[in-house]
A protein has these predicted regions:
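Short, hydrophobic/aromatic alpha-helical segments in well-folded domains
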Residues: 13, 39, 61-64, 116-120, ...
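Glycine-rich loops and low-complexity Gly/Arg-rich segments
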Residues: 15-19, 49-53, 124-126, 153-158
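Aromatic (often tryptophan-rich) hydrophobic motifs at membrane interfaces
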Residues: 72-163
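Short, conserved active-site entrance elements at the starts or edges of catalytic domains
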Residues: 31, 35-84
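Acyltransferase donor/substrate-recognition loop-hinge adjacent to the catalytic core
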Residues: 1-51
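Short, contiguous, pocket-lining structural segments
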Residues: 5, 9, 28-32, 70, ...
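A short linear-motif detector with a strong N-terminal bias
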Residues: 2-6, 54-57, 109-110, 136-137
Length: 164
């Protein structure tokens, strides 16, 4: 439960989704895979690329879902008013520790990404969730900070001191 003042903003956004839409959450499976892949493919990439090598975050997500059995990926697809809107999925790194590897939404409605994550997390038996790196993207970093993390790891980047 998101109790206490720390989570007031998250509760407000989640309740807004519940008030303004008919949300339905379905487990990621054979019957929802096509919808999940469609969400990932329709997701706006913006500048979410890894440096200059042309790798795209959505391709990683797509592969994770296509290999969900081998990777033991579990997840949900969120439908708003009957339309596939968001997908959240990941896998356990250890007992009680879940890694959220896939989190995409095709809606600009406030609170949808929080709602989808909450719906996945409430189905899991875990004490902690790893949200992975934010790639230096300000909007993603802000969203993750609003989830009130218990801890953050410092990210380091190695660069050569010479050319050649």
């Amino acid at each position: 439960a998101l109790s206490g003042g720390t989570y007031a903003n998250l509760r407000t956004q989640v309740h807004k989704v519940e008030r303004e839409y008919r949300p339905e959450t379905r487990p990621l499976g054979e019957d929802t895979l096509a919808d999940a892949l469609d969400i990932i493919r329709r997701w706006e990439h913006g500048h979410c690329r890894f440096d200059d090598c042309g790798l795209r975050d959505d391709r990683v997500d797509e592969e994770a879902l296509l290999l969900r059995r081998e990777l033991e990926v579990t997840g949900i697809v969120l439908y708003l008013d009957g339309r596939p809107t968001a997908v959240s999925a990941g896998f356990f790194l250890a007992p009680g520790l879940f890694d959220l590897a896939v989190a995409k939404s095709v809606s600009t409605a406030q609170g949808v990404s929080y709602y989808a994550k909450r719906e996945l997390f409430r189905r899991l038996d875990c004490a902690a969730v790893n949200l992975e790196e934010d790639l230096g993207i300000p909007g993603l970093r802000q969203m993750k900070n609003r989830l009130c993390p218990a801890a953050k790891n410092e990210i380091w980047e190695a660069r050569p001191l010479w050319n050649g």
